[in-house]
Swiss-Prot record:
Its cofactor is [4Fe-4S] cluster; [2Fe-2S] cluster. GO terms for biological process: biotin biosynthetic process. It is an enzyme of class 2 (transferase). InterPro entries: Aldolase_TIM, BATS_dom, Biotin_synth/BioAB, Biotin_synthase, Elp3/MiaA/NifB-like_rSAM, rSAM. This is Biotin synthase. The lineage of its organism: Bacteria, Bacillati, Bacillota, Bacilli, Bacillales. NCBIfam families: bioB (TIGR00433).
């Protein structure tokens, strides 16, 4: 149930409305609040969400441009070199196929098209396909393009920016201290370095987390603080969908109420930022999915990289039934 609460949600709301950082203890109080406090917490988070984003919901669609064949040993990922999960494997798709995916994103009313590729870092040949596709998409469609291709250096970041990539995603994934328990083939610092290159290039930085990989509540709060310090414009909050054949296959799902508390925490700590309910939304939040949008203002529609999402029409209905509106892409 959680511990009894003496915290004033009004006080925390006032801080967030002024974009003032809450304390570590206030963050812990949110996560450890009695479950009966849930609606009060979500109401407080909604006040902040509405102040900065009204009732708009941003829709994003993922396109898996390269699947499998990844040399990294991330414990959560079915595309990892250490995974035995039966995932589809293919090299970088061509420009025509990537562009066709963008047309599907438009049909789903997405404003952002997210081109994702497995691997440690993109090769120059892979960048050729992606940048050519991005140029065609941005010249012919009312879409913003986000790319998630792995580690970047200055030259590769510059190429993506010049091609028209609006935003680049590179998640911190977990707490700095927990990172070695999740992967050892790259460091937490490697991820921060890529985000620095993204900012320097002029692309909008997108970075988030995966909840449910064995982190503590204090680490979750500190992860929210880390994202505030990074100043990511968009924060995807994933909830682990444990996949058979990966090292984390036996991790329990995050309880829906805990997931909602995490989303509220992210809103309070990063009040002016896009908070996106991302991978594992359907699997972990289940019937409480609609409540997530009282804290978050963004979702993915359709499938994820190697797991299924729900029907796009279902997401549209959730937004409509809440009295919210789909945000149109503003180019």
């Amino acid at each position: 149930m959680g511990k009894p609460i003496t915290l004033s949600w009004e006080a925390i709301t006032e801080k967030a409305l002024k974009n003032e950082r809450i304390t570590l203890q206030e963050g812990l109080d949110i996560l450890e609040a009695d479950d009966r406090e849930l609606l009060s917490i979500m109401h407080a988070a909604y006040q902040v969400r509405f102040h900065f984003f009204q009732n708009k919901v941003k829709l994003n669609m993922i396109f898996n441009a390269k699947s499998g064949y990844c040399p990294e040993n991330c414990g959560y990922c079915s595309q990892s070199i250490i995974s035995n999960a039966p995932v589809e494997r293919y090299t970088m798709l061509d420009q025509k196929t990537i562009v066709a995916g963008a047309r599907e994103a438009l049909k789903r009313k997405a404003g952002t098209y997210c081109i994702v590729a497995s691997g440690r870092a993109p090769s120059h040949r892979e960048l050729d396909e992606v940048t050519a596709a991005v140029k065609e998409i941005t010249e012919t469609m009312p879409l913003k393009v986000c790319a998630c291709l792995g580690l970047l250096n200055e030259d590769k970041a510059k190429r993506l920016k010049e091609a028209g990539v609006h935003r680049y995603n590179h998640n911190i994934n977990t707490h700095q201290d927990h990172h070695p328990h999740i992967t050892t083939t790259h460091t937490y610092h490697d991820r921060l370095s890529t985000l620095k290159k993204v900012k320097q290039s002029g692309m909008s930085p997108c970075s988030g987390v995966i909840i449910g990989m064995g982190e503590t509540n204090q680490q979750i709060v500190e992860m929210a603080f880390a994202l505030r310090a990074i100043d990511a414009d968009s924060i995807p909050v994933n909830f682990l969908h444990a996949i058979e054949g990966t090292p984390l296959e036996h991790q329990e799902r995050t309880h829906p109420i805990k997931a909602l508390k995490v989303l509220a925490l992210m809103r309070f700590v990063n009040p002016t930022k896009e908070i996106r309910v991302s991978g594992g939304r359907e699997f972990n939040l289940r019937t409480l999915q609609p409540l997530a949008l009282y804290a978050a203002n963004s979702i993915f529609v359709g499938d994820y990289l190697t797991t299924k999402g729900q029907q796009v029409q279902t997401d549209h209905h959730i937004i409509e039934d809440l009295g919210f509106d789909i945000e149109e892409c503003a180019l």
